[in-house]
């Protein structure tokens, strides 16, 4: 254990975020720059930084804003993007990712941020933090720019598990509505189930079953179910929460990121074409800046792992300092709001409702004494 004064010692009021400094595409320097950016904006945040101490100490020492705000936890091993989750679960105890999660498990930190291997992070999170009672499959939720008044939709799952049956999709709806209530203060969010069309007869069998389950639970869980939605509705204003399986969601998010990158490049090329177009770009600078900010994926960098006993935020592996800072901000806000505890209560309530429904159904079913048979 090395570093400056521990965040908890420096100021007991600070919310402590545990950060895996390793595993990102750009290395620990970008992660340290990102937490320094967060520290300069937020005096109420402290950090536990996990990774090889000899690499991290000089990086932290160069950042004046981190003085007294960071404690370095020496972790010699690194989870790479090539490592299989099963291998990490067996042999990952000495890694920075394991160490970062352990700080949340022990109560030293209020949330964790990692840029590392998504599959390994989810596997270790389930191993060290455990799933909430009643949750079958955790999900990764992201904020997606949209035309809604709040400016974003929540979409899940975007890669935690490529499979999802009807019960899983119902749980995603419940967890997604809890997330958006806390992050955007929407008392009765609208939920859409992603499909190949909006008609009820379209889609796979599990989607049709999920449609019925979500419809049945909407009123009890205090959300509005708008039915099936299509890919074109993801950035629209029809729904606030988009529910899908991890395979479809991951393809959608990668497609969206690629399209945003193409749009930025096309606009830049168009305005650099001639002297007149450059003059037009100068005149439209304010509007173009707003557009660039609107579609900048770094602003919403960070997928939240829902369904765990703790707050885990997965930053994009290629995130720069701005992206890392955005992920830290998200972890801080969720920790400040006690989101993990609220989600646990919501899932427990949903499980109780399901059990009550099952009990009622059993009570209503005719027993042997009502069959009218005699021996």
Swiss-Prot record:
Main location: cytoplasm
Catalytic activity: a fatty acyl-[ACP] + phosphate = an acyl phosphate + holo-[ACP]
Pathway as given in its UniProt record: Lipid metabolism; phospholipid metabolism
Chain residue ranges for the region called Disordered: 354-375
Family: Belongs to the PlsX family.
Assembly description: Homodimer. Probably interacts with PlsY.
Name listed for the protein in its UniProt record: Phosphate acyltransferase
Organism, scientific name: Ruegeria sp. (strain TM1040)
């Amino acid at each position: 254990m090395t570093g400056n004064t521990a965040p908890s010692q420096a100021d007991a009021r600070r919310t402590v975020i545990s950060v895996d400094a390793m595993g990102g595409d750009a290395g620990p320097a970008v992660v340290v720059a990102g937490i320094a950016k967060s520290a300069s904006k937020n005096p109420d945040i402290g950090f536990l930084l996990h990774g090889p101490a000899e690499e991290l100490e000089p990086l932290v020492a160069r950042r004046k804003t981190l003085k007294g705000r960071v404690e370095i936890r020496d972790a010699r091993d690194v989870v790479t993007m090539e490592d299989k989750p099963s291998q990490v679960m067996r042999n990952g105890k000495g890694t920075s990712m394991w160490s970062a999660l352990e700080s949340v498990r022990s109560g030293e930190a209020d949330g964790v941020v990692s840029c590392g291997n998504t599959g390994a992070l989810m596997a270790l999170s389930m191993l060290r933090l455990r799933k909430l009672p009643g949750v079958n499959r955790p999900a990764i939720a992201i904020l997606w720019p949209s035309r809604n008044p709040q400016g974003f939709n929540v979409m899940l799952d975007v890669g935690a598990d490529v499979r999802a049956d009807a019960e899983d999709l119902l749980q995603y709806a419940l967890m997604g509505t809890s997330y958006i209530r806390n992050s955007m203060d929407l008392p009765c969010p609208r939920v859409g189930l992603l499909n190949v069309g909006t008609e009820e007869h379209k889609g796979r069998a599990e989607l049709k079953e999920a449609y019925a389950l979500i419809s049945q639970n909407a009123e009890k869980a205090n959300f509005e179910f708008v039915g099936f939605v299509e890919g074109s509705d993801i950035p629209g204003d029809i729904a606030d929460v988009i529910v899908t399986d991890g395979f479809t969601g991951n393809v959608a998010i990668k497609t969206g990121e690629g399209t945003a990158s193409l749009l930025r490049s096309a606009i830049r090329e168009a305005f650099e074409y001639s002297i007149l177009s450059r003059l037009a770009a100068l005149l439209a600078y304010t509007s173009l800046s707003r557009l660039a900010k609107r579609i900048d994926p770094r602003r919403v960098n960070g997928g939240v792992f829902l369904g765990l006993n703790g707050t885990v935020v997965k930053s994009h592996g290629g995130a720069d300092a701005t992206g890392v800072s955005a992920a830290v901000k998200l972890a801080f806000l969720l920790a400040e709001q006690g989101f993990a505890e609220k989600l646990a209560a919501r899932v427990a309530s949903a499980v109780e409702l399901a059990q009550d429904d099952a009990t009622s159904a059993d009570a209503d079913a005719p027993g042997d004494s009502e069959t009218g048979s005699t021996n």
